[in-house]
Amino acid sequence: MGRLFGTDGVRGVANRELTAELALALGAAAARRLSRSGAPGRRVAVLGRDPRASGEMLEAAVIAGLTSEGVDALRVGVLPTPAVAYLTGAYDADFGVMISASHNPMPDNGIKIFGPGGHKLDDDTEDQIEDLVLGVSRGPGLRPAGAGIGRVIDAEDATERYLRHVAKAATARLDDLAVVVDCAHGAASSAAPRAYRAAGARVIAINAEPNGRNINDGCGSTHLDPLRAAVLAHRADLGLAHDGDADRCLAVDANGDLVDGDAIMVVLALAMKEAGELACNTLVATVMSNLGLHLAMRSAGVTVRTTAVGDRYVLEELRAGDYSLGGEQSGHIVMPALGSTGDGIVTGLRLMTRMVQTGSSLSDLASAMRTLPQVLINVEVVDKATAAAAPSVRTAVEQAAAELGDTGRILLRPSGTEPMIRVMVEAADEGVAQRLAATVADAVSTAR
C-alpha cells in the first residue's frame, strides 16, 4: 500500500493528520486522475459524509479541491458510504467521495474514493492519486478559470433514490417482525429506520440522534450491549447494529445473542443456494472468518474462497470470480447484485426477509453454524512491521501453532487503519484459545 491510503481510504485524527489542506489536495488529485477528460458535459463527483463534526470542514476542503479542477461537487449530505457508492453509478458521476472514519472514534475522520460505477479503487490508482498529492507527479495542464471552475450542487433526491434502491433487497413483506436498530448516531440514523419501516417491519430505533460528537460513542456495531438490552426490553424478534457509515451490519437474536458477520453469511449463503442465486456455489470470506463458517459451508456443499482482511479484497475476489456473496466477520457483507460495496441496510433487509420466508427465528437460522471459540486481542504498537517480524513474536506464533495442530489456528495481522496488531486464536477449547492469544499478544507488546 502507499503512504496515505490504508485498507479503507485515508484516515487520521481530523485537523491533525487529516487536515483541510490534505483533504483539498486529495479532492484535487482525485479530480485530475478520475474525471473523464474529453467526455461531453460537465465532470461530476458525488460527495457524502457521516455526521461527525469534522465532516463539515473536510467536506468544504474536498469541494475546494474538486471545483478548483473543474469538477462539479454533487453534494448528497449525510448518507451511508454504500449510498455514495450507489449514487456514483446512479448519477453516472466520474467518481465519488465519502468523508467518514466508519467505526472509528469521533475525533478521527477519513476520505474514501470510489471510481466510476461506485467501485473501490485499486492499489495502482490510489498510488497515482498519492503521487499527485505528494507532488511526485504534476498532473496535466493549467487549472480552469471562469465558467470552467466546478460548481456545488445539492442532490435533493439522493436519499429517496438510495431508499428505492435498497428496497429491492426485501423480496417479502416484513410486517410480522419487530426489529431494534442501533444507528450508532451515524450516517444511517435516518435512512436505516426508514428503509426497514418501508419494508413493513415494526422498528425501534436507538442511538439515532447524531449531534456531531456522539457517533460510535458506546453504541453501534462495536458496542452491542445497548442493542441487546433494547431487544430484550421490547421483546423484539431481532436487533441490527450499524457502524458510523453503515457499511456494516451485525445482529442479535431475540435472546440477545450475537449473530456476527460469519453467521449472517452462512444464513444468506444457504438462502441463495436454495434459490439458485449463489454463483458457482461459492462464498468469499477473509482469513478472519471462523472455522465454523468453513465447516458449515462444507456440509452444505458450498466452496469458500479466502482473501486477506478488508472488504476491498473481498470485492476484488467477487469481481474476479463473478461470485454473488462475500463478506467479513465484522459485518461487511457484499452482494454485487445489490451494490458495489458492503451495505449494512441491504444486509439487514436480506436477513429479515429470510426469517419471514422460512418462518424461522434468527436463532434457529444462525444455528446452521457452530462458532468455534475465537479470541481476538488488539495490541497497540509503535511500528507494526517491526513488531510482527520480531524473532520473539515468530517463536511465540510457531509454538502456539504447534500446540493447536489441526484443532485450531492462529493469525497475526497488522491493522490497516490503526497502530495495532491483531492477534487471533481459534481452538476447540476457549481456555486454550485465551491462553495462547495472551502469550502471543504479550510477545507482540514487548517486541523490540
Curated annotation (Swiss-Prot):
GO terms for molecular function: magnesium ion binding; phosphoglucosamine mutase activity; phosphomannomutase activity. Gene3D superfamilies: Alpha-D-Glucose-1,6-Bisphosphate, subunit A, domain 3, Alpha-D-phosphohexomutase, C-terminal domain. It is an enzyme of class 5 (isomerase). Activated by phosphorylation. GO terms for biological process: carbohydrate metabolic process; peptidoglycan biosynthetic process; UDP-N-acetylglucosamine biosynthetic process. The modification Phosphoserine is found at S102. SUPFAM superfamilies: Phosphoglucomutase, C-terminal domain, Phosphoglucomutase, first 3 domains. Mg(2+) binds at S102, D243, D245, D247. CDD domains: GlmM. Pfam families: PGM_PMM_I, PGM_PMM_II, PGM_PMM_III, PGM_PMM_IV. Binds 1 Mg(2+) ion per subunit. GO terms for cellular component: cytosol. Belongs to the phosphohexose mutase family. This is Phosphoglucosamine mutase. The gene is glmM.
